[in-house]
UniProtKB/Swiss-Prot annotation:
The family this protein is said to belong to: Belongs to the bacterial ribosomal protein bL19 family.
HAMAP family assigned to the protein according to its UniProt record, in alphabetical order: Ribosomal_bL19 (MF_00402)
Name recorded for this polypeptide: Large ribosomal subunit protein bL19
Keyword terms: Ribonucleoprotein, Ribosomal protein
GO biological process: translation
Entry GO CC: cytosolic large ribosomal subunit
């Protein structure tokens, strides 16, 4: 039974998602369908929570829009999420940043981690295509022998 669940989850799991953490400022690109057209809409904010694992993993992004705090929950493996860009990384000492809900202005700022390389979405795509190509070459060479 457990094996069957893993097979179904593997079918829907996304591989090309950047490894972001709590406190990171991210830009989530969401697919919006309007009539027969599809477009991408960016939602930029701070990751205040990550929960679940596997295909059920979700995260909450909080931003301030026109002076009002707005939080949105995203499922990491949702087909509506195109990709996630990491804008900046912050130094935090908590697993959940729910206390930011009560902070306003400068008190809600997080200290930025300096000297940390921020991965880009294009680098991730290059790495996954290179890994897939090398895996395909290994399969071809092993089947040729």
């Amino acid at each position: 039974m457990d094996q069957q669940i893993r097979l179904v989850e593997a079918k829907y799991k996304k591989e090309a998602i950047l490894p972001f953490e709590i406190g990171d400022t991210v830009k989530v690109w969401v697919k919006i369908i309007e009539g027969d057209r599809e477009r991408l809409q960016a939602y930029e904010g701070t990751v205040i929570s990550i929960r679940g694992k596997g295909i059920n993993k979700s995260f909450i992004v909080r931003k301030i829009s026109y002076g009002v705090g707005v939080e949105r929950i995203f499922l990491l493996n949702s087909p509506r999420i195109d990709h996630v860009d990491i804008i900046r990384k912050a130094k935090v000492r908590r697993a959940k940043l729910y206390y930011l809900r009560n902070k306003v202005g400068k008190k809600a700022r997080l200290v930025e981690r300096l000297g940390v390389k921020i991965p880009k979405h294009s680098d991730l795509i290059k790495n996954t295509t290179e890994e897939n190509a090398s895996a395909a070459e290994e399969n071809n060479s092993s089947s040729a022998e």
